Every structure is written in C-alpha cells, then in structure tokens.
C-alpha cells in the first residue's frame, strides 16, 4: 500500500488547533481528543477494577483470613468483572478505534463526530452510577458479573436498579460507537482504498461493530426484564408466575458470547498490524484473516449454551453447542497459523509492542486450548463453576485483550505523543506483566481441576499453596500497571522525538503523517495505489 500525500493540503490547518481549557475536552468532536479520553477513562477503570481484584486476591491469600466480609467479597467479584469488561477493555478498544481508524483509512474524522462525543460522555455517568452502589445501604451488586436471576432479581440488594440503569447507559454508548465505526469505514475511505486493502484492525472493528449492534439490544432487553420482575410484578424469571430462571441465562448468554468476541477481535486486528511490522514482511494470508474474522463473528451467535451445559438442556442441544463451539477453533487456528507464518523467516526485532504481540499469540492459544476442554459437554460437568473456568477466561482476556491493548499502546504512542517511550522500561513492564500474569492464573487450572469452586471468599486447606502463588502473581501484575502509567506519562512529557514512521516494517496511511499526529489530518484525502 503506498500513499501519495498532497503537501499543500496542510497549509491552512494550523489556525484550527484545539480550544483551550476544560471545555476543549467536554465539547470536542475531534476523533483524536475523543480517542484520548476513551483511553484515559479505560485506564482509570482498569486501575479501579484491578484494585477490586487485589481485594479478591488478598482475601484468598490464605484460608480463613476474613480480611473483608463474605458479602463484600461477592460485591468485589461482581464489580471487578463488570468494570473490567465494560469499563476497561471495551472503552480501550473504542479509544483505539477513534484514534486509528480515520488515520488508517485516510478520513478527516469519524463520520458522526457529535454522536462520538455523546457516546463517550455517557460512560463516566454510567460508571459513577455503578460504583455509587457500593456506598448504598444494602451494598453493591453481589450476584456475579453474569447477574443470574433470581439472585439478581428476587434476592438482589436494593441498588440493583442503579446497576440496571448503568448497563443501559453503557449499552447506548456502545451502540452509538458502533454505528459511528460502521458509518466511518463504509463512507469515508480514501480513494483507492477498497475493503480488501484496509488494515486488519479496521476490518476487525467493522465486524465487531456489527456484533455490538446485534447484541447490545439483547443485553438491554434482559436487564429491562429484570427491572420489570423487580418493580412491576412480571415474572419473566420466576417459576411461580409461569416464568423460568433459565430463560435469563439463554437471553444473557446470547448477548454474552458475542460480547467476548467483541473484546478479542480488535486485539486480533491490532496484532495483525504489529507482527508484520516487526517481522518486516507483509501479513501472511490477509484474505483468509478477513474471512476467519467473519466466520468467528458468525459462529459466536450459535454457541451461547456452552455456558449452560449443567443447567439441564436436552442432550441433542448439548451436542449441537459442543460441536459449534469446537468449530470456532478452526478460524481462530487459521489466525494463529497466519501470525506464526508471518514471523517465519522474517527479520524479527523484539521491541515492546512485538513482545506483547508474541506473548498474545502464545498465551491466547493456551486460553483457547482450555476453552476447547470446556467445550466438551460431558467433561464440563467437572469444570463448570470451578477455578478452571476462571483460569480459562483470564488467559484469553489478560494476555488476549489486555496485552493486545498494551501492544497497541506501545506501537502507536510515538504517533500519539511525538516521543519515543523508554524501551528499557517498556520491556521491564512486559516481563513483569508476563511473569505476574502467568503466576496469577496458571495455578488456577490446577485448583480448578482439583475442585475449587468460583466466587467463594474461603476455601479448603488443600488449595492453600496455589492460591498464595496466585495472589503473589496478581499483586505483582497489579503493581506493574502503575509502572505502565509512569512510562506513558514520561513518554508524553518528553523522550527522543519520534519520526513519522518509527517502526521499520510498519505499513499504512497512519505513518504518512507527522508524529505527533496533527490535530486535523487528511483534510484532502490521500490517494491509495
């Protein structure tokens, strides 16, 4: 992909810099400002959700500690999950989308800039509403991040209504963000940029946006049904009135399974840009990557009941969902094969983004293998609701989504800030995260297979050693992220000036503009040959 840029197009832009002061951020419609706000917001939520995880791991450091009340422990597990999923991972990827998609497709901005502003500002409101529940008399949500009825309806604390409204706000924000991404990608590509010339990050986000539009209304529906059951006398989820609590699980997981792919597909896209850049050769199998992404997105809609193997669904249903789930391993395997093939015989260097990307490939694959184990319906009776499940989804979410975000941050920080980050500190952040993360989550496979259940504040003595290991690893991983904050601030404030293209093998339009990226870019669209 080569870009020819009209040098004269940038002449008149210098007059239109950002406004000054606080109102610049409150009222901005600039995709770079909004992307920056999403990224900072998601990092703050990452630290908050992480601090909740530290409470969980402190309680589980030894059996019998009782640092916090069991009721509060359950609020921590619930809030940790909700904040990490809806507050950390998803807004981080939306921030990357806002910053990078216009730069990658040669667009002057997002298609719907004012809606962009609104979809961001809904989020602080939503999370203030959610976190405020912790200070209410009956405490915050205590029913797990999957909020199964009747725990979340009949037996819920009074604050559940705030939780429901917070979910509604997040969902509205996600839908608007997704509409914006689709409108931008389908309408604002530079001349010559066909769909099959787009960077894979753009492709994965296009497909993710369709997933969001499809499933966020389902989440809104299920929490609205909860609201009706709690306050308006319906019995959607109450057998006494002719409803069924299992209906909740079906509706929730019909949202929930595509949701986990919403959290990983953008990471697939980012890694598909980063690995070729540091291998100094084009991505292997571009077309198959696009089709694999589409296949994953399609299959994500027909696997939801694998979360429900032990609830009592007909065996023929279990059989279907088992095979459908295993089928997702095929397009995912295509992707892993292509990433490894891209590195094959490349001129590799191991800067921080590449380290995170390689760790992503290896550890995400481990998480995928434990997922295949969980997909086996008869075996799942042993794994279900144990720490093995916790190990599985943290191996896909931490080295998957979170490492994908770290890799992207290090990869694009020079473009955002105009400075190179400190490579030595970046590598240190990587290795501490890598060791801490594996130390925290690998032992969970063992205690899970030995029968330790999830969501408990105390446990049998036989699980003590591995839990202490997990806690030490988790504290190490958590503390390291404060160090990451230091690296980013240091990079913003100074460092070696970044060239327009700081990475040798990087491809794409975003490297044709100066670093830091000007406030307005591609006012005249570039020509893509």
Pin down the residues of each PLM region.
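Membrane-embedded and interfacial regions of multi-pass energy-transducing membrane proteins
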Residues: 2-529
